[in-house]
Design a protein with these regions (language model features):
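Acidic/polar low-complexity segments with low predicted structural confidence
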Residues: 1-118
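Negatively charged
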Residues: 2-11, 17-31, 35-42, 46-54, ...
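Short structured motifs
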Residues: 81-87, 298-299, 344-349, 364-366
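Exposed acidic/Ser/Thr-rich ligand/metal-binding surfaces
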Residues: 83-84, 93-311, 369-370, 474-475, ...
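Short aromatic-acidic-glycine turn motif
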Residues: 320-328, 389-393
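Extracellular adhesion/glycan-binding regions together with long Ser/Thr-
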Residues: 331-355
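Low-complexity, intrinsically disordered segments enriched in Ser/Thr together with acidic residues
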Residues: 353-373
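Long, acidic serine/threonine- and proline-rich intrinsically disordered regions
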Residues: 366-570
Length: 570
């Protein structure tokens, strides 16, 4: 727990930069609103993640059906830090207690190919490529051509032995490869066969995303790989949802595979992509030019292959009198991890880890009734665990093989009730940072709705608020998208002017990118914001209509004005 600048940086044998200023809560920190041991009342707890020495040893039994593999000499290390505002006013009744959980994983090796006929362990990854082949994909024809090429690019990037399938999506869902049976392992032969099947796909029909994801989930469930992944592309809207309602499909498959989704063209629905990826633990993306899609797919598959730790659980052990409101992923993208409950412990499943940092916002409801002032009380205990391991396990085994993982000590979420108004108003920079990110996303969505309904003045006002928030947060990606819609006169004050030629699709890109967040204040508490607004790379203003156009364009696509060669960005 970070309180007003107190941070223990002693690594404690775990991930660098994480300290362990408390006794190991796995060894018996009492719950039930009791005082946190080892500290005087009112002192700031540590936020450490020193990882204890692993107890899982080399030679532990591999999971059923996989080949034995030696445990790495230096297993992956998981770190956990909790940062929160701990002081709440005693006279305010039941209130929300917010904490930011930072989970860091280090020492993960990427996914490598497997020899299907050899003794190597089964591959960690199984991949299903879902390609929108609805009628709109042939208007223009270059969309379906780019989709085919992107799918082939992704196939070529898969390591040998990786099980894969290709699904053609319309109002129905059809497995075009393999033509029958289960997913096939990647090889020169199966890639060539799949490539022919992909290039034979023709556009026609409607769109039912529920059917696409259901078929992908069934293929992956039959395969049983530790890291099941879906890469979905669409250019439209879920117009045939009644055939297989998406809400029920997401309820069925949440937590069972990861889905990354891409928008292409001019008619796709950003909210649809965000809805799918936030429930299926993925990310939403979009490309403005069809030609960008193959390289974007290649980059995504490359990043995916760096994730070989299948999953971790964030467990929240609630003290009596505390109620869990939610846990959300806030960085690097926003999402809602699925949860299960077993007694007092609530487990949230997080999928497919590489060497990375993710941040989560935990919200608990606590009540001061019957509690002493000035005493540190444990509202909950947070731990990172391997799925299936008993509570308090210092290390565990993750499929495939016998991969040992070094887990950190659990960390308490602490509340201290106070009648000091100064303490009660003390903010936490990290909590505030992500609250502003959510405000940014909400503001962008409201601006999009106002623009769609013709309320341009309202849209401009909201876009000004969004620019001010993005500037404060240091969110360059969002600022770049905002610059396509407005001319930014004063980013701090939110003074903006709507550009000519703005279309609704520009807001779809903005909504999509608003789910990609910045990490927040650094370990020493410095804020992340206040950045200089940078010009969008490769764009310039048309001197005639002032629409943002590619700097290499010979004429403006909006007003057809002839542009001078090599126009420089302002």
């Amino acid at each position: 727990v970070e309180t007003h600048g107190n941070r223990n940086a002693d690594g404690g044998g775990g991930a660098p930069g994480f300290g362990n200023g408390l006794p190991n809560p796995r060894n018996g920190v009492p719950g039930g609103g009791s005082s946190v041991p080892g500290r005087a009342a009112g002192s700031g707890p540590g936020d450490g993640t020193g990882a204890p020495a692993p107890t899982a040893s080399a030679g532990s039994a591999p999971s059923a059906g996989s080949s034995a593999a030696p445990v790495a000499a230096h297993p992956p290390v998981v770190g956990l830090a909790v940062s929160q505002r701990m002081y709440l006013p005693a006279g305010g009744g039941a209130q929300d207690l917010h904490a930011i959980l930072t989970v860091r994983v280090e020492g993960v090796s990427g996914i490598e190919g497997a020899d299907p006929g050899g003794a190597a362990p089964a591959p960690s990854l199984a991949e299903v490529l879902v390609v929108d082949c609805s009628a709109s994909m042939k208007a223009p024809e270059k969309k379906i051509r780019a989709a085919r090429q992107a799918a082939v690019t992704a196939l070529k990037a898969l390591p040998d032995g990786t099980p894969f399938a290709v699904v053609k999506g319309t109002h129905r869902a059809e497995t075009v490869y393999p033509p029958s049976g289960p997913m096939r392992p990647a090889s020169a032969q199966t890639r060539a066969e799949a490539e022919r099947a992909v290039y034979a796909m023709m556009a026609g029909g409607g769109t039912c995303v529920g059917n696409w994801l259901s078929l992908a989930g069934e293929l992956l469930a039959e395969q049983g790989a530790p890291i099941p992944h879906v890469l979905m592309l669409t250019d439209g809207r879920n117009e045939h949802d009644d055939r297989n309602p998406l809400a029920g499909v997401l309820d069925t498959w949440q937590g069972r595979f990861v889905c990354d989704a891409w928008g292409i063209g001019r008619e796709w629905d950003a909210r649809l992509l965000v809805r799918v990826t936030s429930r299926l633990h993925g990310s939403a993306y979009a490309v403005r030019e069809e030609s960008e899609l193959p390289s974007a797919y290649d980059d995504l598959i490359t990043g995916l292959l760096a994730k070989s730790l299948p999953e971790l659980e964030i467990r929240v052990l609630i003290s009596p009198g505390t109620r869990l409101r939610y846990l959300r992923q806030m960085f690097p993208t926003e999402g809602n991890p699925p949860q299960t409950e077993d007694g007092r412990a609530i487990a949230f499943t997080t999928r497919a880890w590489g060497n990375e940092v993710r941040r989560y916002q935990l919200c608990l409801t606590v009540d001061p009734a019957g509690r002493e002032l000035g005493e540190d009380l444990q509202a909950a205990l947070v731990e990172v665990a391997v799925p299936g391991a008993p509570p308090g396990s210092p290390a565990g085994s993750v499929s495939p093989g016998s991969l040992s993982v070094r887990l950190p000590p659990a960390q308490p979420c602490v509340v201290q009730w106070t009648d000091d108004p100064v303490l009660a108003r003390t903010a936490n920079e990290e909590v505030d940072h992500f609250a502003k990110h959510r405000q940014l996303g909400d503001t962008v969505a409201l601006a999009a709705d106002a623009f769609r309904l013709g309320r341009r003045n309202e849209a401009v006002t909201l876009l000004g608020v969004a620019v001010s928030l993005a500037h404060e947060l240091g969110a360059q990606t969002q600022l770049a998208e905002l610059q396509r819609i407005v001319e930014i006169r004063d980013p701090a004050a939110g003074h903006v002017v709507l550009r000519d030629g703005v279309q609704q699709i520009d807001f779809e890109y903005l909504i999509t990118m608003s789910t990609h967040t910045t990490q927040g204040p650094t370990a020493d508490g410095r804020p992340a914001g206040g950045v200089t607004v940078q010009p969008v790379a490769g764009l310039t203003d048309c001197p005639n209509c002032h629409v943002r156009v590619p700097s290499t364009a010979k004429f403006c696509p909006n007003c057809r004005h002839l542009l001078a060669p090599r126009v420089e960005a302002p």
